[in-house]
Curated annotation (Swiss-Prot):
Protein's UniProt name: Anaerobic nitric oxide reductase transcription regulator NorR
NCBIfam families cross-referenced by the UniProt entry: PRK05022.1 (NF003451)
4-aspartylphosphate: residues bearing it: 57
GO terms, biological process: phosphorelay signal transduction system
Domain Sigma-54 factor interaction: 187-416
InterPro entries for the chain: AAA+_ATPase, GAF, GAF-like_dom_sf, Homeodomain-like_sf, NorR, P-loop_NTPase, Sigma_54_int, Sigma_54_int_dom_ATP-bd_1
Amino acid sequence: MSFSVDVLANIAIELQRGIGHQDRFQRLITTLRQVLECDASALLRYDSRQFIPLAIDGLAKDVLGRRFALEGHPRLEAIARAGDVVRFPADSELPDPYDGLIPGQESLKVHACVGLPLFAGQNLIGALTLDGMQPDQFDVFSDEELRLIAALAAGALSNALLIEQLESQNMLPGDAAPFEAVKQTQMIGLSPGMTQLKKEIEIVAASDLNVLISGETGTGKELVAKAIHEASPRAVNPLVYLNCAALPESVAESELFGHVKGAFTGAISNRSGKFEMADNGTLFLDEIGELSLALQAKLLRVLQYGDIQRVGDDRSLRVDVRVLAATNRDLREEVLAGRFRADLFHRLSVFPLSVPPLRERGDDVILLAGYFCEQCRLRLGLSRVVLSAGARNLLQHYRFPGNVRELEHAIHRAVVLARATRSGDEVILEAQHFAFPEVTLPPPEAAAVPVVKQNLREATEAFQRETIRQALAQNHHNWAACARMLETDVANLHRLAKRLGLKD
């Protein structure tokens, strides 16, 4: 079988139609799955000896949250080391990273697998993976045809990464440095709230403004601080962390500003405080609302004038520190109650960021669950850790008062319980492995009884017609997105729509 010019042109056109990188990547993967007639396809980005999924089709949604470290996935390591198409034999002893992650085929092992490394010049930037349930599924495609596919995908990914690099470095195109993969904190989530937060982080990171990060306990405020620091001009200098809630009043000032020998009982030598340690870098003050009013006044002086005094020393030291502060309190309410200084609040909240709670992040809970499942798999030396449909349903309907931290602990506990109930190194997490209190799953909706008389075929077609109409409306008449939502092949969807009179 050979690709026609029309097929290649269709792939190129789909890449251009996309609005933004993510949409282009998804169009590419969906189109490839149709053209190659595979059961699953994925576009992965390579970063620091791990592959990060950017777009998937035919795989469980939690795959987007997983991070595939090379040391834990020998097939992906083989793809990363290869300079060309990699075909794994059907009887390969190397485990497939997607075993158990193809919906409807969880108990079956993937048989056919092809890996296409993607390069920008000599640099490995990603990979395309193609998987099928039939051993000879990709034999009809020559290596040359697959190289053409890889070239199109590599071009799209390389352009996206270069634009990302230019935006993060705020450079003009003429000043662009050669593409280099830079490891940065991964903030997992595609929900509107997280997408907006990532944009705001990109904006404020390039500045030197102080930032106030608010959010409930367990939402990931420290992760936001790390992301800001790593994307800032201060990234080459230290990020120093201080938990204000864990500071006894007697040592809080010394922790922040340092002390000199003899300043108090037990001060047997000079000691630098967190501000000195963070000089030319960033200081992250977690739970800043716990600081006393006296310390708040001294912190305000540092922010205003840039100098500190060690405890027991009359001399001032100049410091150049960017302050990122976090709180789970409503500091406006604290100001009104007289527990937090208004002037300090205004100094810190020049660019406030709010981290959304997990219950408001929709399907992000499944992506994060996939991330934690992969972490557990590596730590415990398991071949695979997958979520059953029942477990996914439970996670999506639990409200998680402890947010991401609670989800992480719940996944770890569930893996331990599931592992204890079955032999072998494969773990499938079921709903009963989670101990969430007061979880009420929505009852199945009762089917409406038709008022008019219809035979079974007419009723089925009416249901299909209405379902497709609603899906098209929700996806702005994008057929590929509609097919993903309905979990069907887009070509089959087109044929069904024509038969139902929805298309000419």
